[in-house]
């Protein structure tokens, strides 16, 4: 299956820890489970028009959840922490908000 840049990057992670890392030009995204580091790097550079220095990925296993006697499982996920170069501009997630 051929993944486009918009298929690879699912959504940004907006937590207190990830917001603090943005000061060091480190941005966290939920990415497609089958995407590798080079695909994530290419996708971030294309979508946000920045230069990527480094990509770290974390595979997360979905939790098992119960509702009464029914047992289900949440989907597995992959998180990517993308470090930008010093000369790159910052990625603004909240441009349109007032």
From Swiss-Prot:
GO cellular component: ribonucleoprotein complex; ribosome
UniProt keyword terms in alphabetical order: Ribonucleoprotein, Ribosomal protein, RNA-binding, rRNA-binding
GO molecular function terms listed in the Swiss-Prot or TrEMBL record: rRNA binding; structural constituent of ribosome
Organism domain of life: Bacteria
Function: One of the early assembly proteins it binds 23S rRNA. One of the proteins that surrounds the polypeptide exit tunnel on the outside of the ribosome. Forms the main docking site for trigger factor binding to the ribosome.
Similarity section: Belongs to the universal ribosomal protein uL23 family.
Subunit structure of this chain's protein: Part of the 50S ribosomal subunit. Contacts protein L29, and trigger factor when it is bound to the ribosome.
Protein name from the UniProt record: Large ribosomal subunit protein uL23
Gene name of this polypeptide: rplW
């Amino acid at each position: 299956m051929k993944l486009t840049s918009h298929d690879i990057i699912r959504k940004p992670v907006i937590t207190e820890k990830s917001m603090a890392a943005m000061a060091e030009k480190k941005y966290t995204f939920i990415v497609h489970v089958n995407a590798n580091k080079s695909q994530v790097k290419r996708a971030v550079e294309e979508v946000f028009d920045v230069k990527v220095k480094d990509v770290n990925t974390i595979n997360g296993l979905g939790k098992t959840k119960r509702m009464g006697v029914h047992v289900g499982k949440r989907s597995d996920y992959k998180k990517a922490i993308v470090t930008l170069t010093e000369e790159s501009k910052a990625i603004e997630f909240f441009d349109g908000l007032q």
